[in-house]
Amino acid sequence: MKTFQTFDISAEYDAIHRTFPCHKDAPVIGLTGNFQEGACTLLEGYFTSILKAGGIPFIIPPVDETNSLINSLNALDGLLLTGGADINPLFLGEEPIKELHSINPRRDRQELLLAKLAADRQIPILGICRGIQVMNAAFGGSLYQDIHVQMEGERIKHDQDLGRGYASHTVRIEKDSLLYKLFETEILPVNSFHHQAVKEVAPGFRVTARSSDGVIEAMESTECKSMMGVQWHPECFILENNTCMMPVFHWLIQESTSFREAKKLHSRMITLDSHCDTPMFFDQGINFATRDKKILVDLHKMAEGHLDATIMVAYLKQLERTDEALSAATAKADRILNEIEEMVAKNCTAVDIAYTPADLCRLKKAGKKAVMLGIENGYAIGKDITNVERFRHRGVVYMTLCHNGNNDICGSARYNEEGLGVSTFGEQVIKEMNRVGMMVDISHAGEKSFYDALEISSKPIVASHSSARALCDHPRNLTDDQLKALAAKGGVAQVCMYGGFLRKNGEATIKDAIEHLNHMVNVMGIEHVGIGTDFDGDGGITGCASASELINFTRRLLLERYSEESIRLIWGGNFLRVMEEVQRK
């Protein structure tokens, strides 16, 4: 029976609003538009595949205006780099060969920038044909301008005469790859329409599929990021009512949905990193408003990772304990705190100092980032107990009792000498910290120092950047008994992103950090854990290598089925509860 098109828009409009809500939430996927003959175009297969997979396609026109690009990315949950013309070899530092086909300068600059800016924001990316080449070029890889003249050996046909929705050759997939998980096969029939290809994969990526003649057909991130590229055109198959390539698009929608949900969570809660050492780089001329490769925390990276606040510490290396050396340590602590305040003042429209949990809420509502002040190593106060109150009046929210060396307050985990705990002076310091409202931090403290501090303190104490010794036997980590004792007194332990505290052998990744967190939750309870990255103090691991990647930690928490309330507690709720209790007079 034939149905005829109706032209009653009012009826359709009314039908949309017969129930509430009238739509389902879905991730918004940006698709790069082609540009030819003065028009922005996009082949049907791209947006149809995104729609069929459950996403909302949003076409990004080839514009040069940077502000437009960034605002577009901030509205997106995923990015699909589409196919099209050759890439101008000048962007890769090469001269064109005579076999180069047409190029599209309007697209090249925009898409290379889009790929890098999207990756900074941890936006899931899928590259198709030209798109995989754009990804590779953007991150430092190389391309063949023409595989037929620049690759050794014979080539199979890579520009098929068959219809676009039909396979013309096969690719072999690596069994340990994401692509294999999606298709569950080593041999995959694909279509092919290209003469350029990836030559050497960019750092941070690996080859996951090749054609029989050795051409790279797929690559993926080796840094636990949602980034994948394929050389064929999976979007063409759906137009032949063939769903064989839909796993690629389902992957993009799944990753983008996770990213979208993580962004929403961050918008509804305070996210706090309880420990970073960025001031250690102040003498290298860094600018907090510049995205600086030397540091892991700056305004750009905080915004990209959706991090609201960080506690920057004045770190003091443990040196001699002579009167002169102690006086110099106190002066250095003051100088570093001054430098933090000056850095914030220079960027006062975007960031401010927070002294209390209430300040954090106020600054988030104002659209500003927050920096809190800390001191790493009680060496800073010398032997002068009055420095505790003076530093508290400066706004210091916590002080780590010691660092990698014994001091006049307590014994360090670095040496963990038997019987060396909190000294008589150290007991006075802890009690004074309780009195003035400064949190006691026992990261770096030896085991006896830990238990002594727990016994002496009348307020809950924190471990601002420590992990679980049961999973990584390092003296800086806390045993299960220590974790239980800390929780019993209302304290909090913050998982550290330093690789050496997460695993003994091999390279640590975000998966290891999640395992430590899960273990600590099981031992302590959800009300006693948090995140203290130690960024710029040797913290930073694959998958969570800077403040820009902290949104990935939230995505992992969602994958582990943590509730929104649990994630809120992990992301600072627990730590700020202790801060409020300690600061309460």
Question: Where do the model's predicted regions map?
Answer:
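Histidine-centered catalytic micro-motifs
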Residues: S192-A197, V230-P234, T271-T278, V396, ...
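N-terminal hydrophobic targeting/anchoring segments and the immediately downstream early-domain regions
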Residues: E261-E418, D473-Q494, Y498-I531, F535-K585
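Active-site glycine-rich loop that binds ribose-phosphate moieties when present
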Residues: L420-M433
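Catalytic beta/alpha-barrel core
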Residues: D352-I353, M438-A445
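N-terminal beta1-alpha1 cap of cysteine-dependent amidohydrolase-like domains
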Residues: M1-I128, A137, Y144, H148-L182, ...
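Glycine-enriched alpha-helix->loop->beta-strand junction motifs that scaffold or abut catalytic
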Residues: C224, H306-L307, V396-Y398, V436-M438, ...
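Proline-centered loop/turn at the N-terminus of a beta-strand
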Residues: P27-V28, I56, P124, S142, ...
